[in-house]
C-alpha cells in the first residue's frame, strides 16, 4: 500500500515554498545554536520528502546553501528573488514580500516558545503563520487505520509506511533498509565518513544533529535533570533514568543464557561475552584480548607504568580505583565484608572467602606430602606445583594434575622473570612492592626490641618445632613455657 502511494503522484500540487521558511541576517542572529541546527534539519528533510514522492523541480538555493554548510540567511531586498527561486509557487509573491521581515519569526514561533517568552517585544502578528495555522487546522488527509489526520498528503504517505512496516529506502553500500529517507541519509554518512555537524566549542564533528545537541550539553554547566530521591543532578535524561534504577532496584536487562539481570544494557552486552567467549577489545602492545573496554584501559596502565590513583594520606599510588579503595579502608578502619557465621568482618572480600573455609570444616591436605592447610592450599599448590587442591580423605596416590590454562607466559618488567600465568606474576610482583616498602620504612632489629633476656627467652620458646606423625604428615608444635622450677 505504501509503495503504491510512493509511486502515485498526489493530486494536490506542493512546492518547496510551501514548506520552507527564510531568514534575514538580523533574524538569523536571534537564533541560538539549537534552533539553527533544527532549522537546517527540517529544511533538508522537507526537500528530501518532496523528491521522494515524485515532485520534479530544480534544487532551491536554500537547500544548496545548507548542503554546502553556508549560512542560509538572505538580505531583505533578496526576499522577493528567493520567493521566485522555486517554480510552481502556490503562495503569491505579493503575499511573500508584503512582510519581508516576518519570515524567520514564523519558524521561531513554531519551534521555540522559550525564545518568544524571552523576547516577546521582538515579534508581531504574522499573516503567513496565520495562513499556515489555518491549513493545519484543515486536516483533509485521514489515515484509515488509526484515524490520524494530516494537512499535507506526503505526511500521510510517510505515516502509512509505519503501519505497513515497509522500508522502501535501501542503502546501496550494505543493503540496510529504512522507513524514512532522512534515516537513510544519516546512515550513509557512516560509509562516507561525512560529519557535517561541528561543535563550535571543541571542534568535534557528528553525523547527526541530535548527537551534536547532546554533546553541547557537556560544555554548558547546566544539569537540568534532578533525582527526586537523593537530589543528584545529571546532564542527560538517560543518565538520570539509569540512576533511578539504583533506588528502585529495577533490572530490566536480563541475560537469556543464565537469567542474570542488569540495570544497564551495556552491562548486559559485556556479560553476554562471557557466554560467547567474545573478546573484541585487544591490547596493541601485547595482543591480549578483553571482554570490556574498561578492562582494556586498566590493562594498558601496566604497559605505561601509570598509577593514577594516589592515596592523599601516605602518597601510595595504585593502578586501579579498587586498589585505592581497599587501601583507604585500612586508614578508616572499615571492614564491609562480614562473615554470616560468626560476625567477623574483613576489609577485603578475598580474606572473607579464606576465613569461611574454617566454618566449612573442610581441611584441605597436600596429596603428596600430607601437609595440612586450612586457608592457603590453593595458593601453595599453584605457586609450587601448578596443581588444583584436593580435600582431605581423597586418595593420596593420584598423580599431580596441572592447571589447564590457555594464558600466555607472563614476564615481570622489573626483573625479567617468566611465569606460567598471571596469578604467579601477581604474587611475584608483591615481592617488589614489599622491597619498595622496606626501603621507605626504617628497619628495627629484633635484638633492639628483645633487649630483656626474659623477653628473649619467651620469644624463643614460642618458636615452633617440626615433628612428624605416624602418617608422615608434617605437624608444627609450639613449646609451652614451664610454669614451675625446672627439675634437676
UniProtKB/Swiss-Prot annotation:
Protein location: Nucleus
Gene3D superfamilies: 6.10.140.140, Classic Zinc Finger
KRAB domain sequence ranges: 14-85
Pfam families (alphabetical): KRAB, zf-C2H2
GO cellular component, as recorded: nucleus
Gene Ontology BP terms: regulation of DNA-templated transcription
Annotated region described as Disordered, given as residue ranges: 387-408, 435-488
Gene Ontology MF: a single term: zinc ion binding
InterPro entries: KRAB, KRAB_dom_sf, Znf_C2H2_sf, Znf_C2H2_type
PANTHER family xrefs: ZINC FINGER PROTEIN, ZINC FINGER PROTEIN-RELATED
Entry's family note: Belongs to the krueppel C2H2-type zinc-finger protein family.
Task of the protein: KRAB domain-containing zinc-finger protein that represses B1/Alu SINE transposable elements and modulates the transcription of nearby genes in a tissue-specific manner. It regulates glucose homeostasis and lipid metabolism by modulating the expression of the endocrine cell-defining transcription factor, MAFB, in pancreatic islets and, the fat metabolism regulator, ACACB, in adipose tissue and muscle.
Record's protein name: Zinc finger protein 92
Protein's gene: Zfp92
